Amino acid sequence: MKKQYFCNPLNMDYRYQFIQDMRSGEDKISREAADPSMILFQGKYYIFASMTLSVWVSEDMVHWESHRLPDSLPLYDYAPDVRVVGDYVYFSASRRGTICDFYRTKDILNGLFERIPGTFDFWDPNLFLDDDGKLYFYWGCNNVTPIWGVELEPETMVPKTERKELIYGQPEKIGYERVGENHSKMPLSEEEAVEKFKEFLKAQGKDADHLTEEQIGFAKIMFSQRPFIEGAWMTKHDGTYYLQYAGPGTEYNVYGDGVYESDSPLGPFRLAKNNPYSYKPGGFLRGAGHGSTMEDRYGNWWHTATMQISKNHDMERRVGIWRAGFDKDGVLFCNQQFGDWPMAVEQAKEDPWAEPEWYLLSYQKAMTASSSEEGREPSFATDENIQTWWRAAGNQPGEWISMDLGEVKDVRAVQINFADDKIDAPLPGERQGERYIDPSQHKTRWLLEASADGTNYFVLADKSDAETNLPHDFVVKEEGVQIRYLKLTVFEVPYNQNPCISGLRVFGFGNGEKPSAPQYQAERTGTMDMRIIIEPQTDAVGYNVLWGFAPDKLYHSCMTFMPEQNIGALVEGETVYVRVDAFNENGITEGSVRPLA
């Protein structure tokens, strides 16, 4: 079977939202899809994600199509959960203070969704069918309350047991549960949280000396710097129950999924040795939290999760997919070492640790453009950071951005990442609460040309007449194209905004040798922190820092382009082993493994 390729984030039509700011009353406009539930049902793969109004469908895990879901479903409710139960797919979503219903169908794309009246409210639901036919339900999304679990009556979906507290956040001991960029903030005491809230009120010119009980309760939750423990997903493998959960917050680069294990679906649960299970704090697009784990038709395991942009709004997010699995010792892992590089997929059993076939060629390459705004120069399109971008000075068709690779290289793929910036558009419809999701079919149209000499250009891909709106389009030239220059001309983007490119990313093969093995130091800087210092080397573009609880289980990784990297995701008291790999345009070279002192 011929290989096919994709590159995270998934290249889908992420719908725009108009979210009313409670302070200013103005709308913040951004795209979002998050909290994905992925299933295999009747031979096809389906992803249900928050705020998409749709389900994404694929035959091969590479090419996805979006299909509108019926308005009878709670499409404005976060974290849709789907599970296959017999001939049915069951659907539920999140709402606080209102009873949440269940829905089921035998035909996702064409069938009716039968409503099953609910009996309680929940947030971040997850349904799980055990081998013995018993049905369990998990939910929770809070920095005070736990992840809950209960057994349900299969016909009525009414709880058969009392809800049970399963897991709580422990940021004092579990490093990856701490909030902030790179886990930079420790939790506060209740007294400290209240004082911080008072400072906030004073800065707003409001009374901070006479707090109500309600305000004090609010402060203890929202100003505590405690993690939100959320996004449960249960997987059973060889008799062990793996309760996955997300934290510490979707707006951070360290949003990831941890995992607990048990011999029973309702616990007691023990923290797994391999944590965090899904974790991507570095690279072009960061974050890999609140997701789901699924086995495909060929016995390969996959994990899909939420990736963070959070520039136009905290909830500006995307969806990624990575290989996952269980090792010979039953350890659940997810491979995110090069998690936003092109990934090959074959319709067969595959190696979850296969290295990338192509390498990054575009990092910090020379860029020019038809125009740009100050602070949004074309160089931001090659800095491997989706949170920065080139923005043209105008919005007329024909604005362009161009890259010089430095010399002719063997190019195999190009990813074109569009950003949004300062969208000024009228509200297209009526809000539901604070939000309106735009169902319109916008268009993103462009032309990608290439040249070996800078004079004679040929078309690499033409979407100048496209009827689609794909912000992370991916062009594959599997046989290779010998080029030095690329030019992207933009003809249309949504809402007639100025075109913005956060990443014109090129992959293939350079003309040199792999980098030498990196020399590095690894030192503990706290019970949950370590610092990696790498000796700079001219033959490396960047590095991957790997770590794990055994020399042969280095399942966590952080990509960096700097010679120093802090890692705050350690678990107190756990043994840690480290390795640093170097990469450039020609390959990847592994470093030595050593214990963290």
Map each language-model feature to its residues:
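Beta-rich carbohydrate-recognition and catalytic domains
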Residues: 1-224, 236-241, 245-283, 298, ...
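Short beta-strand elements bearing conserved aromatic residues within extracellular beta-rich modules
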Residues: 150, 446-448, 543-545
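Aromatic, loop-rich ligand-recognition surfaces of beta-strand-rich domains
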Residues: 383-459, 470-520, 524-527, 535, ...
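Short, solvent-exposed loop/turn segments in extracellular or other extracytoplasmic domains
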Residues: 466-473, 559-566
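Extracellular Ig-like/FN3 beta-sandwich strand-entry sites
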Residues: 481-483, 540, 573-575
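Extracellular low-complexity, O-glycosylation-prone stalks/linkers
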Residues: 538-561
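Beta-strand-rich modules
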Residues: 567-590
